[in-house]
């Protein structure tokens, strides 16, 4: 998978900018605040329909503008694809080869991408919501139906929460309505749990192998998906309906939904100890690096091709051994795009070196 050309219009600090890319390693060089990360964000948004930095599309528009437009030419298994994403009048329009997509699920996963930045450390150090978001974003690239499941589940969750907030003191009418919503939570939630569990298993096996190489076999990495307090899939699915019934009174008392995949978590462990609680900063960075590279391998196995890799100033956060490991790894990929403040030590590795300054992009010969 490869990007050939990108056009950003009224996106972030870019008024109207086009960029041509090459296979191999592209380095975007420039001082902080010049727009390097915005290029990666534009590519990521174009491929996933989402930003990894903000939740509101309006924040992506250039200052003083109410719209933005993104275009990109890609090669996927020798096929040429033109992707477009337009935000205008508070509406998002996405197109593949000029044909509008009715749903985001028709679009996501057409071209796969893996993004890695220092902020990804939150995947280990942060809360369960950050880890669920990581899983869901990347499952969606493999299985477009997962987006539909998440949207449907969130709607049911909102409806049940609204019902619980009404109170009604556990009347027969309220209980009957809660039971109806519980049926939907059970049906949709079980599919979400199964998808997350399967993806975590694939990721864990590959991540364990890569982490072993990074740590020279000194530590063993495991990733366990915990659903409904269980670390076994069949046990979790069997307990789901029982927990929904048992916790109904407590949910009515607290006026919020307490049971479902919206409260699940993925646990990273080193030698059976919590990496979040006991891992050093270096170990936690190694876990994130291993997980991201494992994700690349999982996509390659499923799609038959490596995804596009975007690296946002990650080398400065890694020690020399891990930095060299990552750079050597990128040699096997079709294309990697990386941001740096200075690329002096990597000019021989790069197939394309670009200078980014004040929203302008130029080649460095």
Curated annotation (Swiss-Prot):
Q: Which domain of life does the protein's organism represent?
A: Bacteria
Q: What is its main location?
A: cytoplasm
Checking InterPro entries in the record gives: DNA-binding_RecF, DNA-binding_RecF_CS, P-loop_NTPase, RecF/RecN/SMC_N, RecF_2
Chain residues that bind ATP:
30-37
**Matches recorded under PROSITE patterns:** RECF_2 (PS00618)
List GO BP terms, alphabetically: DNA replication; DNA synthesis involved in DNA repair; double-strand break repair; SOS response
User: Where, if anywhere, are coiled coils annotated?
Assistant: none
Task: Write out the entry's keywords from A to Z.
Answer: ATP-binding, Cytoplasm, DNA damage, DNA repair, DNA replication, DNA-binding, Nucleotide-binding, SOS response
Where is this chain's protein located in or outside the cell? Cytoplasm
Q: Name one GO cellular component term.
A: cytoplasm
Any one Gene Ontology molecular-function term assigned to this protein's record: ATP binding
Family membership, please give it.
Belongs to the RecF family.
PANTHER family in the record: DNA REPLICATION AND REPAIR PROTEIN RECF
Function recorded in the entry: The RecF protein is involved in DNA metabolism; it is required for DNA replication and normal SOS inducibility. RecF binds preferentially to single-stranded, linear DNA. It also seems to bind ATP.
This chain belongs to the protein called DNA replication and repair protein RecF
Organism the protein comes from: Desulfitobacterium hafniense (strain Y51)
